From Swiss-Prot:
Gene that specifies this protein: UIP4
Keywords assigned by UniProt, alphabetized: Endoplasmic reticulum, Membrane, Mitochondrion, Mitochondrion outer membrane, Nucleus, Phosphoprotein
Polar residues bias (residue ranges): 129-149
GO cellular component annotations of the record: endoplasmic reticulum; endoplasmic reticulum membrane; mitochondrial outer membrane; nuclear envelope
Subcellular location(s) per record: Endoplasmic reticulum membrane; Mitochondrion outer membrane; Nucleus envelope
Signal peptide location: none
Membrane disposition: Peripheral membrane protein
Region described as Disordered: spans on this chain: 72-269
Biased composition (Basic and acidic residues): 73-83, 155-183
Main localization, broad class: endoplasmic reticulum
Assembly and interaction partners: Interacts with ULP1.
Protein name in UniProt: ULP1-interacting protein 4
Amino acid sequence: MVTIVFDHPAEDFPELKIAGEFTNWEGVPMKINTSSGKWEYKFDESSVTKHNDKDKVHFKFIDQNGNWFADDEYPKEVDEHSNENNVATLNNEEDGGSAGEEKDEGDKTAHNTNENGSELYYEGPETPTPSLKGNVTFPSPKTAISQDGSAFAKETTRKERKYEHAPLNEVPVERDPKEENKELSPNFSQEQTENKQDKGLDNLSEGNDNDNTRVNEDTDVTDTQESEHEINGSDTENTDMSEQEEIQKIDKPADQNAKSIVKEGDANTEDYESVLKKLLGALGRFFGSWFSWLTTKMSSSEAS
């Protein structure tokens, strides 16, 4: 008898069938072996037709949903219809044998090709475990020098040798330059702030002096231009020569006094008021004489 074992727990499949050359490819229910707890199927070798004196049999499993599949625990082989089936070798002894017992031997011979040239499934030998034994020596951390940081490693080694035997209180303490900069930065920033404040006060005082000077100069020039414009405007009027001479005689002292006051740059309001009063008086006399002359001329023209 030949026994085919489904090498998985029986509870994974509530129902399992097998079909192969020994069942004429019809699904036949498998049975659970109570001792092993796995699905099994037994058949007689006489029910199998041997092809070309090769002791092997092809088969597939069928689950509870009717799906046909080949199990990975058995070697696989593709038939002439491109169907992938499980294959198991048979025992030639008279007392029979088990396909499950011969499964390992079938794995070793599965690399042989069948009659149609199809190659059997074969995983190959296992990779040997590499040995870690050897005479490899690793350099110590103090003497190891890398290609990228050889100079740094040498400098570190020299420093370690230098302070190797020195007492702890004599070993110089290297200070971080960043900390020194942090200690100096407050004094430096305070001096900069004081210098900036002094410069700002000096610039502010100079700006105020310049503004006062400009205001005085602009005021003097404006007053001079206004007075000259008013005087020149009075001289260009079409008046009688005699009246113009009298007006000029009267206005000249006032103009001279106004110009002298303006040139001196006195900013008192009383002086400006007196100058304005004199100018207004001169203008009033001028317009009064001009008006009298105009009325006289108009009356004479009407009489003629």
